[in-house]
Amino acid sequence: MSLHISPMSPSFGAKITGVDLKKAVDDDVRHQLQKTLSEYAVLVFPKQFLEPADIVRSGEIFGNLMPQQLKKYILPDFPMVGYNSTKDLPLKDGKLQVRGENYHTDHSNSVCPPRATALSAVKIPATGGDTQFVDVRQAFDDLSNELKEKVIKMRSLHVHESSRSPRMFTKLSEEDLAQIPEVIQPLVIRHPMTGRAALYLNTGRMEGIEGMNLDEGFALINSLYEHATSPQYEYRHQWTEGDFVIWDNRSVMHQANADYNPEEFRYLYRIMIEGDALQAFSQ
């Protein structure tokens, strides 16, 4: 098996060819893929056309699978595999209401957020429905030294849904909400494999900054978010059926797009990889 890595943007993202994810990989390939994900943060495996069992095995290359939170969107025979389907999305003014239509990192209100998330494209509309990624490592690197010193020791409370969330969340019962954690996370984290610093942002879940009043805290969050989502930090993935894409939630944020014909069918499988508690870069 001859693995080939093709960078897709100046700072992150790589296309991986020369590997068939419908077959088990050996330890050398496994270790190389793990290292490549840590370095490039987003890996695209084209033309894989994976079945659910293949997706489970492919995810396990990178670690143990993490249960899906939205239990009504999982495969009965493969409970670790979720799905995103247009058939489950509401319409408002002729536009699909897509979950995740704002840059974020998955389940940041978990004590141990997923280290990675992956999608496998089954059915894709003719146009639109891209997934965008931004490199929050490079975004931190490009901050002024003064701002780095200011934010490097800061922390933020992450909840199910921020009081100033810009995006739609699935409505939950009071009983379900009571089961969902709230956790204080570092504003700047250290990647456990590479040691790189990265901004840790999720405007849908962050409830201000410790030690600042709410208005000041949200102003800082929004300023960092605007900086981190600038076009120079972006890779935009245009989906093709058969794509398997995995990304490192500790190095990038991502967002969905609802800019496609709601009458066209879009269906992707989804898995998450277990992570550890986040490490503050200041530690």
Please identify what each model-predicted range represents.
Residues 2-244, 249-283:
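Non-heme Fe(II) oxygenase catalytic core, chiefly the N-lobe of the double-stranded beta-helix
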